[in-house]
Structure formats: structure tokens, C-alpha cells
């Protein structure tokens, strides 16, 4: 099964997430099929909090990819902002 989820990056206590399409069996931060964007929960000032290619996300959802709960809410947020 293919899922759209977040892969954690960044330093300790400074999380940064890539939004990726991956096989469900792959490790959280492991192999992925395609990168769709990023999410920075600790963005300050002029830093960008969320960047997501909505067209690619919609294409993967049409192919049957299942988004995680958090990614589903981020896709809604990105659509609203666009």
C-alpha cells in the first residue's frame, strides 16, 4: 500500500518534516517514492511553514495513496492557502 506521510528531519528539538509518498512497509525516514513538499512546525518570522505541491498530492490520491491524518489536514490547509 502506498501512503503519503511525513519523514522527520532536522535536529533534536528542532523538527522538520518532508512530506513524501512511500510504501507503507518502508521505515519512517527511509526509502520513499517522491517528495511532495515540507512542513516546518517551528517556523518563525519570514520562514515558510508549509510548502506542498497540491497537484502532485491530488494525483497520488487519485492513484489510491492513503494520506496520514496529519498530512490530510496539511493538504486541506495548502488548498485553502492557494
Curated annotation (Swiss-Prot):
Keywords: Ribonucleoprotein, Ribosomal protein. One of its GO terms (biological process) is translation. One of its GO terms (molecular function) is structural constituent of ribosome. InterPro entries: Ribosomal_bS16, Ribosomal_bS16_dom_sf. Gene3D superfamilies: 3.30.1320.10. One of its GO terms (cellular component) is cytoplasm. Belongs to the bacterial ribosomal protein bS16 family. PANTHER family: 30S RIBOSOMAL PROTEIN S16, SMALL RIBOSOMAL SUBUNIT PROTEIN BS16M. NCBIfam families: S16. This is Small ribosomal subunit protein bS16. It comes from Francisella tularensis subsp. holarctica (strain LVS).
Amino acid at each position: 500500500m502506498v501512503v503519503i506521510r511525513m519523514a522527520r528531519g532536522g535536529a533534536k528539538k528542532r523538527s522538520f518534516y518532508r512530506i513524501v509518498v512511500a510504501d507503507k512497509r518502508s521505515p519512517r525516514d527511509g526509502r520513499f517514492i517522491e517528495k511532495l513538499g515540507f512542513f516546518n512546525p517551528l517556523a518563525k518570522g519570514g520562514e515558510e511553514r508549509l510548502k506542498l505541491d497540491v497537484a502532485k498530492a491530488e494525483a497520488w490520491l487519485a492513484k489510491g495513496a492513503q494520506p496520514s491524518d496529519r498530512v490530510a489536514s496539511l493538504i486541506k490547509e495548502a488548498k485553502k492557502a492557494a
